[in-house]
Amino acid sequence: MPSKGSFQWNAVRFSNKVFCVTHAIKNSMDWDYLIWLDADTYTFRPMPASFLEKLLPEDSLVTYLGRGDKDPECGFVGYNLRHPEIQNLNDEWEDLYINDGIFKITSGWTDCSSLIHLTKKYQKHKGVTVNDIGHASDVKGHHVFINSVLGLYMDHFKGNRKESGTSWKKDFWPQSHKETKNISQLDYWKQIK
């Protein structure tokens, strides 16, 4: 559980992102998917549509970067707008922040805390599937974004990395997947410190 003074208890700060995402979902229903990408990300090489299609399975409600027992990394989240539960999830997520339900969540009040709270609830009670491209896919390390398949195309300047303008070499963990095994050898990643 985060300490009392932690940013993770700032519901107002994180409600902005939740309201942005829920508004986008409501206004994008002519599309199949909505992808949230934090503004502090950098795409360093072209990403083929086939890559995104593989990340966003038709049967999954959301695709996210899980971190095991910690809240997910929500710098990238794919929302399946054709899933029969997407509107319910969206309405319930927004409602947490409008009607103070967020304050009942004991792990934190961030967008990440509330999203994982709801997806676990939907998995348990509604039988939905989610696509965890982080720890559930055997990605190692705390900075799951760059250690996942997303690191083949993007960097996420989370936290103090904004100052340096890149992630750090120490963020990389040895990978066991064929697809990401040599990720740190891509030209972009070879230049970081």
List PLM regions with ranges.
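Catalytic core and acceptor-binding pocket of nucleotide-sugar-dependent glycosyltransferases
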Residues: R82-K193
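Active-site acidic Asp-centered loop
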Residues: L37-D38
